[in-house]
Design a protein with these regions (language model features):
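Short charge-dense sequence patches
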Residues: 23, 53-63, 92-103, 135-137, ...
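Catalytic-loop motifs flanking and including active-site residues across diverse enzymes
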Residues: 37-41, 105, 141
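Short glycine/serine-rich loop/turn segments
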Residues: 1-93
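A short core secondary-structure module
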Residues: 78-130, 135-137
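Predominant activation on well-ordered alpha-helical scaffold segments within soluble catalytic domains
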Residues: 42-46, 75, 104-111, 146
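Hydrophobic transmembrane alpha-helix bundles
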Residues: 38-50, 91-101, 154-169
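A sequence-composition feature that detects small, non-aromatic residues
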Residues: 29, 42-44, 66, 90, ...
Length: 177
């Protein structure tokens, strides 16, 4: 089954407009843009004619249209879903994500796309934690996070960094833009 939708020009914007083919209509927010760049994939679901759609995500291209269109959307970790056949924009960031209106459908699509993964497949040796950002979370969230790391990442160096300023995060995000 193949489907084609419209994305913004060169899949490079986060608002989803396409001046050449028309901006996909966001029926969940009349008069508002659908978000981009996978705008057509998200807007198609606002018609209630489809159960789910797929989009590519490099720097927000599934998550942003999901938010703008009132959908459930996800960008899984890089290389978690095969990108064969996906036109690359930034191969070291590109991944495939999906949208749905229903949590049940969203989960079913996820079960198909994200086949079961054994924890032994995890092959990284280092995990970096931004302490000052973690401190912004509620105490219960911090405790759950630390317990998860302790119980699920044994034998992995856990470097704890502090003073990760918002400016550093913003500067690194600019690279994606």
């Amino acid at each position: 089954l193949n489907g084609i939708t419209i994305c913004d020009e060169f899949f490079y914007s986060l608002i989803g407009e396409n001046k050449y083919y028309g901006t996909p209509i966001n029926l969940n927010a009349h008069g508002c843009v659908p978000g981009g760049s996978s705008s057509g994939s998200a807007a198609a679901l606002t018609t209630d004619l489809y159960d789910f759609s797929i989009g590519s995500d490099t720097g927000g291209s599934v998550r942003i249209p999901a938010s703008f269109c009132g959908l459930i959307g996800m960008r899984p970790t890089h290389n978690r879903i095969n990108t064969k056949g996906v036109y690359p924009m930034a191969p070291s960031f590109d991944t495939v994500g999906w949208f749905a209106n229903s949590v049940v459908i969203f989960q079913k699509v996820g079960e198909v796309l994200l086949d079961k993964m054994d924890k032994s497949d995890i092959n990284f040796r280092q995990f970096v934690i931004a302490e000052d950002l973690l401190e912004l979370c509620d105490a219960a969230v911090q405790e759950n996070f630390n317990n998860y790391i302790k119980n699920n990442l044994p034998g992995i160096d856990k470097n704890r960094l502090s003073n990760i300023s918002k400016d550093i995060i913003a500067d690194n995000f600019r690279i994606l833009q």
